[in-house]
Amino acid sequence: MVNSMPKPFLTPGTLYCGAAPAVISTVLGSCVAVCLIDRHNRAAGMNHFVLPHNPAGEDSLRYGDVALDRLHARMGELGCETKDLRAKVFGGAAVLPFGATGDSVGTKNVKIAIEWLHAQGIPTLARRTGGENGLLIRFYTATGRVLVRTIQSAITIDLGGISPAFDSRQSPFFQE
C-alpha cells in the first residue's frame, strides 16, 4: 500500500536506496536525478546531484561523479549486479545563467550522467532532461514508474504528505 511505504524527499547532495517499496521524490532545476532499478533483486535507488564534478576532488554527493559511483555502490550492497540495472534520468534544465560560450550547468550534469551510465553498460530506459523548467519527480520503486510534473517558475509546490529527508544516520538514506 502506497500510504504505508517510506516517502523520502531528496534534497541536493543526497541519495536513497532500498529493497522495500518506496516513493522517492525530489524537485530538480539544473540538478539531475538518476533512478536505478533492479527488478530481479527488487531494489531501487535515486540520487540528486548539483554539479557534474568538483575540480578540487571533494568527496561529496553534491557532485555527479561521486553521486553516481555511490548510488551504484549502494545498489551493489543490496545485491544488485550492474548487468541487471536499468536507469532513468531527469533534470538538467537551463535555469541558471551561463556565459555565451559553453554548456549550461544542467547540460553538463546530464552529460556526465549519460556518459557514466554508458561507461557502466547500464541501459537508460527513460529520460526527461533539459528545457527551461524545473521538474517534480516521484519514483515508485516497486514498479519503476516515475511521475514527472513540470514546475513553472514562481509557483508554490505542495508536496502533499511527502516526508522531508531522513536523518543522515538512518539507513538507507545518505546525506552529506
From Swiss-Prot:
Keywords annotated in UniProt: Chemotaxis, Hydrolase
GO molecular function term, any single one: protein-glutamine glutaminase activity
InterPro entries (alphabetical): CheD-like_sf, Chemorcpt_Glu_NH3ase_CheD, Cytotoxic_necrot_fac-like_cat
One Gene Ontology biological process: chemotaxis
Cited Pfam families: CheD
EC number: 3.5.1.44
Catalytic activity: L-glutaminyl-[protein] + H2O = L-glutamyl-[protein] + NH4(+)
Gene3D superfamilies in the record: 3.30.1330.200
Transmembrane stretches, start-end: none
Function, as annotated: Probably deamidates glutamine residues to glutamate on methyl-accepting chemotaxis receptors (MCPs), playing an important role in chemotaxis.
Family statement: Belongs to the CheD family.
PANTHER family attached to this UniProt entry: CHEMORECEPTOR GLUTAMINE DEAMIDASE CHED-RELATED
Name by which UniProt lists this protein: Probable chemoreceptor glutamine deamidase CheD
The species this protein was found in: Rhodospirillum rubrum (strain ATCC 11170 / ATH 1.1.1 / DSM 467 / LMG 4362 / NCIMB 8255 / S1)
Recorded name of the encoding gene: cheD
